[in-house]
Every structure is written in C-alpha cells, then in structure tokens.
Amino acid sequence: MDEPSEKVDPVVNPETQMYDGSQREDEGDSPDDSEILQPETLVKVMKKLTLNPSAKPTKYHRRQRVRLQVKSQPVENRSERIMREVQSAFPRRRVRTLLSVLKDPIARMRRFVRIEQRQRQLEGNERRDEPFRCLCTFCHYQRWDPSENAKIGQNQKN
C-alpha cells in the first residue's frame, strides 16, 4: 500500500530517550517531564525529519472533484434539461422590492433629503411656490403626483 519512500520517520521525544538509544520508562513524578527541550536535542530531532520529494500531489483538488461529480449526474427528464438551459441563458437577478429599496443607501439619503425639505417647508423656511409632493414610497416610485389629481377633481366640479 504505502511505498517506503512515503513513510515518515516517527518523532522521538528526546526527554524519554537515553543517550545510548534505549528508551526509559515514563515517570509521572519526574521533574524532567516539565522541562523545556534543549537546543541540542531539538537539532537532533529536526535532523531526523525529512521532506519526501517523491510524494506527488493529487491530480484534482477536492472542489474540482465535487464539481466533476455534480456535472456527471445524468438529467432525469427532458423538462429538467430545458429548464436548466433557460436558467443558464437568464441568470438569477435580484428582485427590487420595497424592502430592498428602503435598504438602498442612496435611495434612503434621497428620501431623507426630501423629508428634510418638507419639514423646512412646513416651518416656513423655504419658499411656498413649490407644489405639494407626497413623500411616501408609492407616490415616489409610481411617479404619482397627488397635486395633479387634486386639480383634476377641481376641474370636474366646475
């Protein structure tokens, strides 16, 4: 299964190994267990570690393998195939709803500016020659002007 060149040498704890190569028994009460490794022992351990240049990377990454498996699944029927072709021709787009409009920062700033202008107008700080404009989102996005409707109602009474 594993080639001998792919095996990694086991890491030997230098604290548990004696200088003559024999392993000593682990003693739980020993003060040597809590000591920090000395530089000489670290160098010896590091010399034993080697990188294997004969190890080859896999042909495909994991994500690529998953994509290949998904693409290789057969289409169950003709209607699904047609639906996928149509979906690929028209990518999904976000739907613009009232909530998404309210979250849009530019639209929010415009709305706040209009509200602020309206408040100034009510206080009398701005000139009065501007016609009434409703600040609700329906009137804004439908471009519906209630002042024109009020004029139409007045014309019908005459």
Curated annotation (Swiss-Prot):
Residues 58-68 have a biased composition (Basic residues). One of its GO terms (biological process) is epigenetic programing of female pronucleus. GO terms for molecular function: histone H3K9me2/3 reader activity; methylated histone binding. It holds the Pfam family PGC7_Stella. It is found in: Nucleus; Cytoplasm. The keyword Iron does not apply. Mediates binding to H3K9me2 via N-terminal region, while ability to exclude TET3 from the maternal pronucleus requires the C-terminal part. Residues 1-38, 54-78 are annotated as: Disordered. The keyword Transport does not apply. PANTHER family: DEVELOPMENTAL PLURIPOTENCY-ASSOCIATED PROTEIN 3, DEVELOPMENTAL PLURIPOTENCY-ASSOCIATED PROTEIN 3-RELATED. Primordial germ cell (PGCs)-specific protein involved in epigenetic chromatin reprogramming in the zygote following fertilization. In zygotes, DNA demethylation occurs selectively in the paternal pronucleus before the first cell division, while the adjacent maternal pronucleus and certain paternally-imprinted loci are protected from this process. Keywords: Chromatin regulator, Cytoplasm, Developmental protein, Nucleus. Residues 26-35 have a biased composition (Acidic residues). Transmembrane segments: none annotated. This is Developmental pluripotency-associated protein 3. One of its GO terms (cellular component) is female pronucleus.
